Amino acid sequence: MTSVVEGKIEVDILVIRAGDVLKMAVPSIIFRQDAADFGIQVLDSDGKVKKPGITPAQAANNERILKRIAEILNKFKNYTVTVEGHANSVTGLEEEETTNKYGLALEPLSKARAEFVKTRLKSYGVAEERLSAVGRGGRQPVSRIGDKDNAWKNRRVEFILNK
């Protein structure tokens, strides 16, 4: 006998140890391509993309995740957090990190993503002195270069806990 149950499973924040580093493992926070915000995609009357962005559901989920992170951080005030921004490298070339030859330079873009998330966490009550932001560019991908279906995974932020 087989039964099917439909429902929603809430995914919470986990803390994992990677060597000597504590990271908050969170559901994906999704950014627009070549942007450091949660701008919503706009379609014209024909359904064509007028302004690129993420879906309203993705933006709402991003905010839900950040609120939950802030809630946890506000309970554990003896930790500071480094928000690490990451970007998606298209070429894997070092000049992509610092020049606009292939699109926006990845180092400043990833730093802007980290700063954006830091600002959102502050708006949810996390003290500014507990937060720092760094940009890692496209040097630490989670999806391989050229994997167009999963490139969005490289446009991310990670949360490093410091005691």
Sequence positions of predicted segments:
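Periplasmic OmpA-like peptidoglycan-binding domain that tethers envelope proteins to the cell wall
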Residues: 53-59, 63, 86-163
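Periplasmic peptidoglycan-binding/tethering modules of Gram-negative envelope proteins
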Residues: 1-82, 92-94, 163
